[in-house]
Amino acid sequence: MFCPKCGHEKPQGARSCDFCDQDLNTPSDSTITDVVRSSGFVGRQRELGELTSALGDAISGHGRLVLLGGDPGIGKTCIVQELAAIADARSADVFWEHCYEGEGAPPYWPWFQILRSCVAESDAERFEAAMGSDAEAFGEIVPELRSKLPNLGVPPTFDPDSARFRLFDSITTYLKNASNDRPIVLMLEDLHWADASSLALLEHIIGDMAESNLLIVGTYRDNEVSLDHSLSRILGNVLRHDGFQSLDIGSLTLGDVGELVTLSGGSDMPRDIVEQAHRMIEGNALFVGELLKLLDANGPGETHAWQFANPLGNQRGHKQTLRWVVRRVQSGADGRRR
């Protein structure tokens, strides 16, 4: 169980939270489980609990970084979506950005997009107060800022290494200061596609976020991160930081798949069909969702019973239909794996 206020795990029988002094004997209007969306999210309770605990740390002033690794389509995005709902309920500002696949994106692209969102959602006075002494650097990377702060000066000229350090430091200072006013959660998806500069900035922020109300959550495909990948080097370097945690997201269990089937109206699906589906799709969360869509494109309907798209209407026919659906899923869902 978790504290309804800060999200930290609470010991059995505890009367108050050790982190925020919340009275655990008094019912809360908003608990962690209340804000987990009822959109078919099953399983992953351990992972969501770890992320919720990290959120509690950040809210309490201990900055955290959590990276989620796993196969494409395994459910990383779904997990962080649930965390975003919890963070929003805890009055944190949540900013979300994906790294760009392919060539052509400028350096620091995901960070610049996040900073643009920060500029758009913050009033000029609050933003200026959080930027610190190197505010001019922001005008170079986020041109929209100059419309809010027309008197913003031009940064002095430095050699490339010094300029990069000042840029990193100014962004880190802003995020730390802004999070003191209101906790900030940054979601960085698809870090396996991140450019080296973006990862270097991430490493810099990690080294100076311990005393902040900042939580950074990143996702990546572990099968696309080789030993010589820039992200592998980052992972090796951040292991020494107390605020870092890595979560490996595995396959859904047979029980999880069965629960998804039930939530989709398939409580009457034969167990051996559920077991075969679990084996064939190897517990991949995206494949499960696509499989359920294709088995009955029209949903469970008013009968709330599963309708097999199969005219044979027998066990052998069900299994043949399942094989056909899995082939369709595997050919059509590959491009949408996350």
Question: Where do the language-model regions lie?
Answer:
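Key residue(s) within conserved catalytic/signature motifs
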Residues: 2-338
